[in-house]
Amino acid sequence: MDKVQKTNINNMRITEIDVIKGICIILMVVGHSGSPITKWIYLFHMAVFFVASGFCWNEIHATSILNVGNYIKKKICSLYIPYVMVNAVYIFLNNFFVKIGIYSNVSELSGGIQLIDYIGVKDTMVELIKTIFFLSGNHVQLAGAFWFIRCLFVVNILHCIVAFIAKKTKRRNTIWVLIFIINCILASLVSEGYFQFLRGFKTTFAAYIAYMIGILLRKYEINLKKVYSIYGFGVSFIVLLIFSSIATISISEGKIVNIVFYVIATVC
């Protein structure tokens, strides 16, 4: 970023971030198309969105109770309400989708996709309550991609609260180191199959790690143009190519292989 962008970074869009997100959106489409490079794309594409969000975090949101409250209200309106509304629509239309064949309750016709059957009023209400409290996992099939909105909302709110508390202490850096370590431990445990009862919250830890990496890039004014130069891109491509032959990552399922693997893939 040039000097003008650094000076006004809080008041203007960051071109590099927009470009990076645009590229990752394209890669996301390619990855979901059954491309030969899907495993390579999955190593980093979702983590990058959380890194970008962390990079755009503004400390002013955590400077007072009023600012924290305003920030939470903003995220409720922009993330939580849309998430609940979209999922609610698909929940209420569940039986209609089964009837017209968009959803299938016949294994021979499912094509390997999750079977979904008709649900009654009670189950509809249960699923709606689960959605409201983020306890439904990715049950609502057509709204499955909204796991990202749910996860981003939780990470944003969690970080704002933690940042506010950290500002009130004298050992701020120590707190952030502990938070990072705790997230690494929890993300690793979730990846190993623990804490499945967390449902919609189990993606939080891996996502928060990527979010914190974005904050560090912003804090130390890492020049994105230099980091993602032709040479940097070459190194990242090779590292990720090697990693893709070993394993892949799925943040939506909390699968990160191991923490070192995940952090390196995210940074690359």
Where in this protein do the model-derived segments appear?
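C-terminal ends of transmembrane alpha-helices
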Residues: V30, G34, N183-Q196, L240-G254
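Alpha-helical transmembrane segments and their membrane-interface exit regions
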Residues: V48-C56, A206-L216, V263-V267
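Membrane-cytosol interface segments of multi-pass membrane proteins
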Residues: M1-I185, F195-Q196, A207
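Non-cytosolic membrane-interface motifs at loop->transmembrane helix junctions
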Residues: K39-L43, Q196-T204, E253-V260
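Hydrophobic alpha-helical segments of polytopic membrane proteins
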Residues: A166-I179, I213-L241
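Small-residue packing motifs within transmembrane alpha-helices
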Residues: D18-I20, L43, F49-F50, T203, ...
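Alpha-helical transmembrane segments and terminal signal-anchor/GPI-anchor hydrophobic tails
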Residues: N223-C268
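Juxtamembrane membrane-interface segments at transmembrane alpha-helix termini
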Residues: C56-L66, L189-G193, I215-N223, F243-T248
